[in-house]
Amino acid sequence: MNPIVEFCISNLAKGGDYVYNQLENDPGIDVLEYGCLQNCGICSSGLYALVNGDIVEGESPDDLLQKIYAHIEETWIF
């Protein structure tokens, strides 16, 4: 079983699409896209994703990508 990273489609339009595509190419991560993840306050203020149910935020697409990988390293039991 792989870590799961979930994106809101509205957040993809703000630069999250770059992160989504990078993660989609990683065979060790399952990436999902939803119409809405019910985190509208966070979504409207910046980039974020749910990583195994935890909110991970970034100031830029590269920052979000690094924080997602860091969160997986810190919390995922391989």
UniProtKB/Swiss-Prot annotation:
InterPro entries given in the database record: DUF1450 (IPR009910), UPF0349 (IPR022916)
What Pfam families does this protein map onto? DUF1450 (PF07293)
UniProt superkingdom: Bacteria
Q: Which family does it belong to?
A: Belongs to the UPF0349 family.
Name the record gives this protein: UPF0349 protein SSP1836
